[in-house]
């Protein structure tokens, strides 16, 4: 695919090229990966300033997203890469290949540096999700810090931090500039910019920024940081749509295809059938989301692909509030279970109190059903990121849910709307229908016909 860079993307790529140390604070969906890869291509294959690049990312992002981006864009043709995930033998084999870019998951940073036996001779490191290194006590932080002096170029990618994430910036910039801008010690940073918030006697549980601290911190790091604030003068889109693609395993795909072709599948000994085109579309949508109802409303689990992606997107939001749109009741149950498991506070937006808490910034994650996201419901004060976990055929419901955040009174520079889409499923047809603004019923029936016909 031909890459037509937005002005801010060209600006950010040039920023990386011109700054050996750079932090790129852009919300997910604005193209941090392609911005960085464009710079890597130039440094490796044009100016020859860089020989070996190490990309550190969350597992699914390392395994799927970065390789997909390299393959996707025409102008990156010739940029070689290797993905070091999997077993130890597989990782070592990948790291011994002669390529320009080595991609590894963050959990294996310590292994790479201390246990693999492979020299750490990368002259450029890209940390995709800089917040992975926000804990200065974590082994991966301490290990990477040891080899940091030998790294000539380093790039940190993350979403724009919330005010709650300011404390985390110390460790992140300690890795980037070795303590030059925010200090070499956390105690000094904490005492300079924060005051105790929640405490019990001498025990402090949390800190809050001092008045003006946020501006002072951003000013201190501004020479090596590009953020949404830094690119205000550029022609930024008011609303950015991002498709977050997940891929089903062979077994999961087989179950999906069986339902699509035969209108029936067998799960755990029980047959689940779809009697007509509309019912089939409903079942396929459920399966794309990860679960399906049986005859007696029992829920059968198919996969966790969308839950994993949702978790990644929430992490990438870097502390900024996220609104999640779900469609089926079992979506709500499974999302709630995953958030509980990860100790992520959330609430269903189903009454005036939960809406008040969202708008006052008390909820990191809020869940909403499109049918309840009616016209006139003001949610824009609470956040600027919307994630569609499950899609709707209804153009009206889709547009009015998006309009809860993308509306007058929204103070953020950009609203980002993510669609989690299961590759090769009815999700893709729903998105096509929404984008073409086709009539709901006609698009639904046509999509099912297309599925049944091949």
Regions of interest found by a model, annotated:
Residues 103-109, 114-121, 138-152, 156, ...:
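Inter-lobe coupling linker of SF2 helicases/translocases
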Residues 61-86, 176-179:
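Conserved helix-turn-beta segment of the N-terminal RecA-like "Helicase ATP-binding" lobe
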Residues 35, 50-72, 163-168, 328-329:
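Conserved Walker A/P-loop ATP-binding site and its immediately adjacent core
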């Amino acid at each position: 695919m031909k890459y037509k860079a937005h002005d801010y993307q060209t600006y950010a790529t040039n920023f990386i090229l011109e700054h050996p140390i750079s932090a790129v604070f852009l919300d997910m969906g604005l193209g941090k990966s392609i911005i960085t890869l464009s710079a890597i291509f130039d440094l490796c294959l044009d100016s020859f300033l860089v020989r070996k690049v190490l990309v550190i990312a969350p597992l699914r992002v390392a395994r799927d997203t970065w390789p997909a981006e390299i393959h996707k864009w025409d102008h990156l043709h010739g940029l070689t890469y290797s993905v070091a995930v999997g077993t130890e033998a597989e990782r070592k084999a990948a790291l011994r290949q002669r390529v320009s870019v080595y991609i590894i998951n963050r959990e294996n940073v310590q292994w790479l540096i201390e246990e693999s036996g492979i020299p750490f001779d990368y002259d450029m490191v890209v940390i995709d999700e800089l917040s992975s290194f926000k804990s200065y006590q974590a082994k991966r932080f301490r290990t990477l810090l040891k080899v940091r002096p030998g790294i000539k170029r380093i790039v940190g990618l993350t979403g724009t931090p919330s005010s709650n994430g300011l404390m985390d910036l110390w460790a992140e910039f300690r890795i980037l500039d070795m303590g030059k801008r925010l200090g070499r010690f956390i105690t000094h940073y904490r005492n300079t910019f924060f005051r105790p918030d929640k405490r019990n006697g001498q025990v402090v549980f949390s800190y809050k920024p001092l008045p003006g601290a946020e501006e002072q911190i951003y000013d201190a790091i501004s020479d090596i940081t590009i953020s949404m604030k830094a690119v205000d003068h550029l022609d930024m889109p008011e609303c950015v749509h991002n498709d977050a693609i997940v891929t089903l395993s062979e077994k999961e795909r087989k179950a999906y295809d069986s339902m699509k072709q035969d209108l029936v599948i067998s799960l755990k000994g029980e047959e689940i059938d779809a009697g007509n085109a509309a019912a089939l579309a409903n079942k396929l949508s459920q399966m794309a989301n990860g679960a399906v109802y049986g005859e007696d409303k029992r829920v059968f689990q198919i996969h966790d692909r969308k839950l994993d992606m949702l978790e990644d997107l929430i992490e990438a939001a870097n502390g900024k509030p996220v609104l999640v749109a779900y469609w089926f009741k079992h979506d709500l149950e499974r999302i709630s279970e995953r958030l509980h498991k990860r100790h992520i506070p959330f609430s269903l937006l189903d009454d005036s109190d939960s809406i008040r808490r969202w708008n006052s910034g008390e909820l990191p994650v809020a869940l909403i059903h499109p049918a309840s996201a009616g016209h006139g419901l003001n949610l824009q004060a609470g956040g600027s990121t919307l994630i569609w976990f499950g899609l709707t055929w209804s153009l009206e419901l889709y547009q009015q849910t998006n309009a809860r955040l993308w509306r007058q009174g929204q103070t953020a520079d950009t609203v980002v709307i993510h669609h989690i889409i299961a590759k090769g499923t009815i999700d893709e047809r729903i998105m096509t229908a929404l984008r073409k603004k086709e009539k709901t019923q006609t698009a639904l029936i046509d999509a099912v016909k297309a599925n049944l016909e091949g």
